Amino acid sequence: MIHYEKSIQKSYKKGEIPKRILRLFHNAFLSLELTKDMNLFDIKKIKGNYKREYYRLRKGKYRAIFYILKNDFYVIHIGKREEVYDKWQ
């Protein structure tokens, strides 16, 4: 199952995340959920000392930050590359 933070929904409603980009990420997460193969996409583990293992998924200039818990995907931030890493921490 894919879970999105409320902040992502707010950003989408404000127009900060284009519908096309949100659809690209959602389709990628659906494919990940079905295949469980992270090598199909441009996904990298985020380095650092965090409580969880965070990953980033890249689609053009946009990034999605997420973690996996019991085969569920929790997307915590979607944004442009320049700002995404500063805002989610």
Positions of PLM-derived features:
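General structural signal for secondary-structure boundaries
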Residues: 21-22, 36-37, 67, 80
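Enriched for short, Lys/Arg-rich terminal
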Residues: 6-7, 13, 59-63, 67-89
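A short, surface-exposed loop/turn module that caps and links secondary-structure elements
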Residues: 30-56
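Arg/Lys-rich, positively charged N-terminal/basic patches that mediate binding to nucleic acids
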Residues: 1-29
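A residue-level signal for beta-strand positions that form part of recognition/binding surfaces
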Residues: 1, 54, 72
